[in-house]
């Protein structure tokens, strides 16, 4: 029986919830189902400015989106014998697992943390890299109520000589420099509750700005240094790369929702009508004082229940939106300056997310970011992605596509993820393997129930922990070669 694995990506945003169902088969990523809800369908009590306000409302909204995506993929069609896609479910694990986005509103970060490990036989193995990263995480001194989401290496030295990839190299002292993103454990527990109520199990958690950058940035941009800004409804999330590694991330509580709020307040019109005005007449390229068509817009007046209206010049509408958008770019720019990497953005500024769809936003950004290039980004095809990808080439879907690509190998090399697993790329044959420091397998497999560790995708997880703290972990003795061989033979038979 052919091996297939299903994974679901779920992006939980303030103004939008998206889900993608993807199939992994023979190293190919195929999207087979998608669904999303926008702000008109999501209960306002569910999520506010990236923060979950109600477990019940949030789980209901997420469950509805996931079920819609699964239905499109045929995953709810067990009894439908005429559905040609339902037959593939026989080879899937019965539990639905999801890669879930995590709002930067909940996160903090620690920069430039170092960890050291000594080699045993004068050769760097994955165990030494694991120990060095764990030592760095311990050195960060996080309290027990904190949970590390990402520990992202950006530099290695071996015997005080800088190296790009230390695996397999000869040396005695390995040092790693990492960027840590963490959150409160309570936030993780609440997210787990929501996803369980939504009918899925969390396989991994990825901060939304990181996922967006995976889906949109090129290798050249990451290497040169680039600021990726995911511009959403109520938040903007900034990620800065330098030398192909994440060096800075920041949550900013501004977004396109604030343009709507300004229009509602300054034009004395109800919020839903202000949103319609923004979508229909929004043009950020207009400058105050510039020539514009003599056009006016009739809009309802607040408090009149739609019985009264007034006329507003189009130029006034566009000026209000432009001023708020400029203020947003000023806030983003200040954060870039605070990062210390403003002079290292050879790849420029990349804008994605729903707000990036606004007419004239790239031109407006260029008037503010004058020292480097600006481009608008949609998800790009990577890792042999197939299926319904054409429908997702939209900046609104950068995060959810990035979640799937993270699973397919788009992560940072030697990253320690939210589950305490070291993920790395094998440059020789790009065959994914499960190398474990614990002799107990992290994922069980059988001839009829296999997992992604058998697929030819450029990613290999290393289980580094059983505890939830992800702090120092004592390495356990690995099985020998012949014992591993016997174990594999016994599983076959």
UniProtKB/Swiss-Prot annotation:
Transmembrane regions listed in the UniProt entry: none
Intracellular or extracellular location(s): Cell inner membrane
Chain spans, region Disordered: 434-468
InterPro entries: ATPase_NBD, Cell_div_FtsA, FtsA/MreB, SHS2_FtsA
Gene Ontology CC: one annotated term: cell division site
Pfam families: FtsA (PF14450), SHS2_FTSA (PF02491)
Keywords carried by this UniProt record: Cell cycle, Cell division, Cell inner membrane, Cell membrane, Membrane
GO biological process: FtsZ-dependent cytokinesis
Biased composition (Polar residues): 436-465
Mode of membrane association: Peripheral membrane protein
Alphabetized CDD domains for the sequence: ASKHA_NBD_FtsA (cd24048)
Subunit and interaction comment: Self-interacts. Interacts with FtsZ.
Family membership: Belongs to the FtsA/MreB family.
Stated role: Cell division protein that is involved in the assembly of the Z ring. May serve as a membrane anchor for the Z ring.
Protein name, as recorded: Cell division protein FtsA
Native species: Helicobacter pylori (strain J99 / ATCC 700824) (Campylobacter pylori J99)
Designated gene of the protein: ftsA
